[in-house]
Amino acid sequence: MAQTSSSSSSTFEHLWSSLEPDSTYFDLPQPSQGTSEASGSEESNMDVFHLQGMAQFNLLSSAMDQMGSRAAPASPYTPEHAASAPTHSPYAQPSSTFDTMSPAPVIPSNTDYPGPHHFEVTFQQSSTAKSATWTYSPLLKKLYCQIAKTCPIQIKVSTPPPPGTAIRAMPVYKKAEHVTDIVKRCPNHELGRDFNEGQSAPASHLIRVEGNNLAQYVDDPVTGRQSVVVPYEPPQVGTEFTTILYNFMCNSSCVGGMNRRPILVIITLETRDGQVLGRRSFEGRICACPGRDRKADEDHYREQQALNESTTKNGAASKRAFKQSPPAIPALGTNVKKRRHGDEDMFYMHVRGRENFEILMKVKESLELMELVPQPLVDSYRQQQQQQLLQRPSHLQPPSYGPVLSPMNKVHGGVNKLPSVNQLVGQPPPHSSAAGPNLGPMGSGMLNSHGHSMPANGEMNGGHSSQTMVSGSHCTPPPPYHADPSLVSFLTGLGCPNCIECFTSQGLQSIYHLQNLTIEDLGALKVPDQYRMTIWRGLQDLKQSHDCGQQLLRSSSNAATISIGGSGELQRQRVMEAVHFRVRHTITIPNRGGAGAVTGPDEWADFGFDLPDCKSRKQPIKEEFTETESH
């Protein structure tokens, strides 16, 4: 017993000496004390030391464990971590923003990133017809679709992604001023019953997946972005694409929703923990007529591209356009190179409409081709044009008396509105020593250079309007001229515009075609009864004015027998206009000889249509002619 006690005492002393002194514990008693007392105290002190040492070890162990867990967490690839750490589903909502990172940043990236698996998003060949429910424009990278219609999107990868990979579709606004806003449906579609009843997708989500029960609709707790996630499925045998059917549940023009703001659809290939393996994006437009909108956008894009290319190509020249003065007009005999000095200055003009653009392009090409023509040839062409302009008054009416008046306007216009013969001819009468003092404008205008009187033709009407008067005793047909549109003016002046179609349907285009019509003929033309008598009376008045003009023409030609020498020959077009003028008007003259007096033919030579005394004491010319003179 004593031997055992001594061995235990020596062991304790050896252990005690190996420990460092600590002020926490009291000193052991001296060995001079009794054996039994010392042994009892040593055992008691040893028991206290043992308990206090175990308590500090446990406290240190727990503290080390906590520090170790904070400083060096277990590796996620160790089997211990895989067995102990819980596996979070990519579709499960996080319980705290600190436990799980957000699946997307505040402003998602829309940059294409094929990634290690060469991630691609493609579309099937689509139609541009107006009846198409969706169509994709590779030129614009833009999807056009109708609301709630199926839009198949093809997913392709070169190598299989890791297990648990998912495909996320997220809408974001395209413009920088709207990119922080969340793309949601408008309140009208969100709260309505259409497309919402019996659907598992939240009503506020714009993008839905059709025909996939594994689709999860995610509302990010940090950014608030809405997206739809589906597990990646490898392509079936014989295909290289994985097709996902998407639906877009709100129009781009909806007020309170997208409100005509363009959006981008970002398709990402993600791992289980949210790592992006690939990214593709395209613009989306939800509208009523995808084919029409695609065609309009592509046409506008091509026009804008052509304008931008032209601006970029000639940008340096356009900067000098306002600094340099326009080139001077080239002198005669200069070569083409000198004439084109300054042509590098470019100017631009915006044109609305394809037709206007093509017209201006023709003008531009004509100007460029003109620069290639030698200057002497251009001068010769301009001289020919000026000569034609000098001769044009013989073919066209001078602007002093305006367009040709219709017969009814001339009949009802009165003498005070008639132009003079000088105005019709376009120049004053030619002077000649043989011309007498009483030869007025009318007489000089009716004479020819050979001294012969102008032949009178009583049938100078619309049907025989090709006849004219030239120098000599014969007549040659003048050049053709435009059809007389006086039929419309005639019927409109009578208050019968509704009857125009009755005549034009039968090929009657001129007023002269109606002169020989009777009231029975008007009935055969299906003219209404209330207009027949009015039209027939108007035709009778027109005939009377025509007969009076022919009588005046004969009298004037018989009285004016003085020859006009030199080059006083009238051109056929001028005479033709004067004939039309005299035939179509009722001319009144003053009563020269009093009542019942017989007037000689020579007394009519000094009268012209523009004399002021023609307005006084008007009397029809028919009453002034005797029977012998009229024949």
Swiss-Prot record:
There is a cross-link at residue 622 (Glycyl lysine isopeptide (Lys-Gly) (interchain with G-Cter in SUMO)). Found in striatal neurons of mutant huntingtin (htt) transgenic mice (at protein level). Isoform 1 is expressed in the nasal epithelium, the vomeronasal organ, the hippocampus and the hypothalamus. Binds 1 zinc ion per subunit. SUPFAM superfamilies: p53 tetramerization domain, p53-like transcription factors, SAM/Pointed domain. Zn(2+) binds at residues 186, 189, 250, 254. Residues 30-43, 86-100, 306-315 have a biased composition (Polar residues). Disruption phenotype: Mice lacking Tp73 display a runting phenotype and high rates of mortality due to massive gastrointestinal hemorrhages or intracranial bleeding. The gastrointestinal tract suffers loss of enterocytes and excessive mucosecretions in the duodenum, ileum and cecum. Survivors exhibit hippocampal dysgenesis, hydrocephalus, chronic infections and inflammation, as well as abnormalities in pheromone sensory pathways. A motif (PPxY motif) lies at residues 477-481. Its cofactor is Zn(2+). The keyword Cell cycle applies. Keywords: Activator, Apoptosis, Cell cycle, Cytoplasm, DNA-binding, Isopeptide bond, Metal-binding, Nucleus, Phosphoprotein, Transcription, Transcription regulation, Tumor suppressor, Ubl conjugation, Zinc. The keyword Metal-binding applies. This is Tumor protein p73. The gene is Tp73.
